[in-house]
From Swiss-Prot:
Protein name: FAD:protein FMN transferase
Binding site for FAD: M34, Y73, A115, L116, D117, D177, K183, I269
Cofactor requirement: Mg(2+)
Residues bearing a lipid moiety (N-palmitoyl cysteine): C20
Function: Flavin transferase that catalyzes the transfer of the FMN moiety of FAD and its covalent binding to the hydroxyl group of a threonine residue in a target flavoprotein such as NqrB and NqrC, two subunits of the NQR complex.
GO terms for cellular component: plasma membrane
SUPFAM superfamilies membership: ApbE-like (SSF143631)
Chief localisation class: membrane
Alphabetically ordered keywords of this record: Cell inner membrane, Cell membrane, FAD, Flavoprotein, Lipoprotein, Magnesium, Membrane, Metal-binding, Palmitate, Signal, Transferase
PANTHER family: FAD:PROTEIN FMN TRANSFERASE, THIAMINE BIOSYNTHESIS LIPOPROTEIN APBE
Amino acid sequence: MKKLISGIIAVAMALSLAACQKETKVISLSGKTMGTTYHVKYLDDGSITATSEKTHEEIEAILKDVNAKMSTYKKDSELSRFNQNTQVNTPIEISADFAKVLAEAIRLNKVTEGALDVTVGPVVNLWGFGPEKRPEKQPTPEQLAERQAWVGIDKITLDTNKEKATLSKALPQVYVDLSSIAKGFGVDQVAEKLEQLNAQNYMVEIGGEIRAKGKNIEGKPWQIAIEKPTTTGERAVEAVIGLNNMGMASSGDYRIYFEENGKRFAHEIDPKTGYPIQHHLASITVLAPTSMTADGLSTGLFVLGEDKALEVAEKNNLAVYLIIRTDNGFVTKSSSAFKKLTETKE
C-alpha cells in the first residue's frame, strides 16, 4: 500500500512539474511600415513580460514614431519640416532619435569616403527614385549641375553638444534623405523593445534590414538567406548564414532601376557625380553590431563598387559579402571580417 501511495505521489509531482514548465512558443508578428513590410519573430518561454498583442501594439507605435520623424514622403514629418525650411545657418532643435541617426550617417560618410551622403536627395529625386515623379527622359547636365551644387555633407551642421540637438543648413535647397539608414534604425528600436520585454531570442526585419539575437526554435542561430540576383526577377538564395547578436543589410541594383534607350540606370546615385552608379557589383551584404550601421554601410559601399568597397572593408575591418556580375554569370567575394564572423557564428 505504501508503495502504491508513493507511486501516486511521484506521478502527481511529475504532472505538477510538467504543468509548471511552459512550452516555448514562436511568436510571429508582421505589418507595414516605411513603404515596405516588417516581420518579427521571438521565442516566448513564459518569461516575456507582455502579451503578443501588447507587443505588437508597441512595435506599431515605435515604427509609427520613426516614420513620423524620418519619412521624406510624409510632408509633416520632422525630416520634411527641416527640408521645407529655407532659413540658412539657423539652428533648429531636432529630436534625439533624428540626431542619433544623422550622427551615424555623418560618421559613415567618412568611413565610406563620401559614398554615403544623406544630402544627395535632390539628385535622387531628379532621377525619379524619391518622392518626385520619374522624369520621362534622363536629366540634362544642366539640371544635374544645378542640384549637385546643393549636395554635400558639409552643407549641414549637426550640434549635439547642448541639451537639445540642433541642425542647420548652408543653402535653402539642402534636402536630407535618411532612407538609406532609417529602416535599420527602426529595426534596432524594435529589437531594443523586445529586450526590454525580456526576449533573449528574436529576429526583426524591415524591408530586408535585419537584426537577430540568440537562437531559433531549433536551437540554432537565426538562418538568414542572402538573395541571389537573377536575370528573370525570380527570387533565389545565394547563401545562408547564421545571424546572432548583430545586424545585417543588403543593397543591390537588380530590383529598383529603369531603362532608357537600352541603358540600365540603378537607383543608387553616386553623390560625387550625380549619376546612377555604373559598375559590376550586383549586391553587397553587410554585417554590423546594429542594423542601422549595416544599413548605412551597405548603401555607401554599394555606391563605391566591388574593388573600392572591398578595399574600404578591409581597411575598416567591415564584414561584407559581394556578388559581382561578370560576362559568365555571378561571382562572390567576402572580406576577412565576414569570413571570420560567419565561421564562428554559423
